[in-house]
Regions:
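Non-catalytic, solvent-exposed segments at the cell envelope interface
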Residues: 1-253
Length: 253
């Protein structure tokens, strides 16, 4: 479904993968923080008519569902993530629905990666742990999205596959930009029907350039996965998170 067709909470869906990307303007390096979708955090709840019912602690991925699948959902997520990270201001957001995943895979082309674990092997033997495989538009959604919902913390395990692909995807986009400087603009235009953002193409170019100076290692919000009464939960280690926020966003002299 294209984003333009979304209007209500019923259309919005949940936030499946949540990343915070920070660029150090002095060093022009990126740091990436991954927030597990089942993280228990303070979110704002709304009734179907859009009236706020106040704040509650729940899975952070649900915050997106209380919006409209467009700007409102993104703004709600931006606020929830900022609160989780001790009030760090977040300037921009970029959201892509599942329809855009295979489109990115088609436009970027074949990417070779090493399968990081065995979480997909039973479902698809092609993705055997340690195997070198090719990810493209035909199988990228399977690689990034599939999880066994019968297994506890399957979303947390799946996150490692997403990190692996992201780390390989960015250099491939950089390679294509060297050959064709307009590639990123064309890519963003092609997937625009499936995305919501308040950032211009120039910001993406800056971030991609900064990625070339970075290791692209992704840090998880510190915590542990636990089994809730109904669904999996991820409980944040607040002390370790505070240390991560300080080391990522502040210069301590």
């Amino acid at each position: 479904e294209e984003v333009s067709e979304m209007e209500t909470q019923q259309d919005a869906g949940q936030a499946d993968s949540i990343y915070v990307v920070s660029m150090d303007r002095a060093t022009e390096q990126l740091q990436i923080i991954s927030i597990p979708r089942d993280t228990i955090a303070e979110i704002e709840v709304f009734n179907p008519a859009g009236k706020s019912l106040g704040m509650t602690d729940n899975h952070i991925n649900l915050q997106y569902a209380y919006g409209d699948g467009k700007e409102k959902s993104c703004e709600l997520m931006k606020t929830a993530v900022s609160k989780l990270l001790h009030g760090i201001p977040i300037q921009g957001y970029y959201s892509m629905n599942t329809m855009g995943i295979s489109e990115v895979g088609k436009l970027v082309g074949d990417i070779e990666i090493v399968v990081p674990d065995n979480s997909l092997e039973e479902h698809d033997p092609y993705f055997k742990e340690g195997a070198k495989v090719v990810i493209n538009g035909d199988n990228v959604e399977e690689f990034l999205r599939y999880r066994d919902i019968e297994k506890s913390q399957s979303a947390l395990v799946r996150q490692q596959r997403q990190k692996t692909y992201l780390k390989a995807l960015i250099p491939r986009i950089q390679e294509k930009m060297k050959i064709n400087p307009s590639f990123i603009g064309n890519l963003l235009k092609e997937i625009e029907p499936y995305t919501v953002t308040n950032m211009g193409n120039d910001i993406f170019v800056k971030l991609l350039n900064a990625a070339g100076n970075s290791t692209l290692d992704t840090q998880n919000v510190p915590g542990e996965g636990v089994e809730g009464q109904i669904y999996d939960e991820y409980h944040v280690n607040e002390e370790e998170l505070y240390k991560l926020v300080l080391s990522t966003f502040y210069t301590i002299s």
